[in-house]
Amino acid sequence: VFGKSVKAMKFDIPTLVWKDKSGKVVTHPMCPDIDDTYEFRPQYLIKFLTAHLFGQNLWMHGHTGTGKTTFGEQVASRIGYPVWRMNLDSNMERSDIVGSKEIVIENGQPTTKFFEGILPKAMQMPCFLILDEMDAGMPDILFSVQRALEKKGLVLTEDGGRLIQSHPAFRFIATANSRGQGDEFGWYQGVRPMNLATLDRFGTFIEVGYLSKDQESKVIAKSFPQMAKDRIEQVVQFTKEIREAFQGGELSTTISPRGSHALCQYFLHMKDLMPDENQAMKSAVEAVITDRAPMDSKQRVVEIAQRCFQ
């Protein structure tokens, strides 16, 4: 203000530096790549980093396509944290999470050996374990991780009751479409109300919304500097109206930042192949949005596209 800068929200956060056997600083193979075009939203970042500093489990919820998982991955990429991901859908089984016994051949003889699942492997190292679709997990699966959420370790009953203790720098991040109280909108099939004891094990909750027009414009401009400013504005307006129609119950499909990126990429490719730039954009919208929209949403998508790209 008045030409002066004010230092605010400055605090140290845990970061990791990895070195190979020779002592050279390297990037951990499970650490996500940095996306230089990514736009962090400060209101979410301060909550995320504070939870990380305190060692809390973090719950991030919001509509599909708001970038919940990507947010965690991009934080991890900048602080050197490896990332494990588990999608807690109906196909996930307890053996996938905690591990299972298998028969192997050792010294020519068959023997039973226990192989750790994703959870015990991740718990023993400094990393983020992202539990995608946490509110769609089956009850028996959620109970498998509940003790680990308490920071009391994980008992592997399948391996003689062996206790796995969490690494001090291990963190849980849950992503969900709900606050854990069930589907408030009636749009997300499979979302279940969560056990209150499970929810209580998450210290910080962040409701993630869609990018603002300015934020999305910056991302697209960084990713596609060859794209005309007026075209970027059209794409951003289109995605905004699609999302608003989705949130208002007019559409059963939406578009994520990844989708808007695909739209621009497809448009620029087709623009070089077609004499009519508007036809190239129409082709891009069809390929990325319209052709995957349910029949009850197609006409509404077409109407929005015609208005935004006329």
Where do the protein language model's features map onto the residues?
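AAA+ P-loop NTPase catalytic core and its hallmark functional loops
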Residues: 1-230
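Alpha-helical lid/collar subdomain of P-loop NTPases
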Residues: 1-38, 42-45, 210-217, 221-310
